Design a protein with these regions (language model features):
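Cap/lid segment of the alpha/beta-hydrolase catalytic domain
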Residues: 1-35, 81-85, 89-91
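Residue-level marker for beta-strand->alpha-helix junctions and adjacent short loops that shape enzyme
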Residues: 8, 50, 76-77
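Short, hydrophobic alpha-helix immediately C-terminal to the catalytic nucleophile
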Residues: 27, 56-60, 199
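Alpha/beta-hydrolase fold nucleophile elbow
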Residues: 36-54
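Short beta-strand immediately N-terminal to the catalytic nucleophile in serine-hydrolase-like folds
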Residues: 45-47, 72, 187
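Accessory cap/linker subdomain of secreted extracellular hydrolases
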Residues: 60-62, 68-179
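Short beta-strand/loop motif that positions the catalytic acidic residue
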Residues: 180, 186-188
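Conserved alpha/beta-hydrolase "acid-adjacent" motif
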Residues: 193-199
Length: 199
């Protein structure tokens, strides 16, 4: 068992840019693990939600030593099905995912004074407690919590790409299906928000 943090999260250095680094980083991680003296050279992956997404992207990289994946409760199209639904920005999901799951670690890493950190922390707490007032903030690009590009800078980048374009194409798993030959056990839930991508 080898836990790995994606770039810019937890113990890994760098900047987190959801999905965009996981293809190359997934390839490198799988092949590194396969070369270790304690490894038999056969690598498998498992995980839920974003960790499922990293598996699909590693499989799309065609890492030769990736033998199987077990993605659970994750999407396969990170434009339509994760960030947007039918062209509509998934505001409530993106606010909570960006702020609660990712924002607190971003804020902890940032070099900010207490005066600068205070309003951002209050904004994260507000989204975590009752995110509905934030969903009514217009324009959605200017939600105060994301104003300084310290917390989840990708949030604004996603809004800058409201249609499927060159930003989304390299990370669309559905388009990569013909080149994925890694066996996969795909687990979903009927009431999971990513069920379309699972099916």
């Amino acid at each position: 068992f080898l836990p790995a943090d994606v770039r810019g999260r937890f113990e890994s250095e760098g900047q987190f840019k959801p999905f965009h680094q996981e293809l190359d980083d997934g390839f490198d991680t799988v092949e590194w693990a396969a070369r270790q003296p304690w490894s038999n050279g056969r690598v498998g992956m498992y995980g839920i939600s974003y960790l499922g997404a990293t598996q699909w992207l590693a499989a799309a990289s065609q890492a030769p030593n990736l033998q199987a994946i077990f993605p659970s409760l994750t999407g396969s199209d990170f434009y339509d099905g994760w960030t947007y639904q039918g062209g509509a920005f998934e505001l409530a999901f993106n606010l909570t995912w960006s702020a609660i799951l990712l924002g607190m670690p971003d804020l902890a890493r940032a070099s900010l004074s207490a005066v600068e950190r205070g309003p951002l922390l209050a904004g994260l707490a507000a989204i975590g407690g009752d995110h509905w007032p934030m969903t009514r903030h217009l324009p959605v690009r200017d939600v105060p919590t994301f104003a300084h590009d310290v917390v989840a800078p990708f949030y604004k980048e996603w809004l800058e790409h409201p249609t499927r374009d060159a930003f989304w194409e390299p990370i669309t798993i559905e388009a990569a299906h013909p080149r994925i030959h890694t066996p996969a056990y795909n687990l979903g839930g009927w009431f999971d928000l990513f069920i379309r991508g699972t099916l």
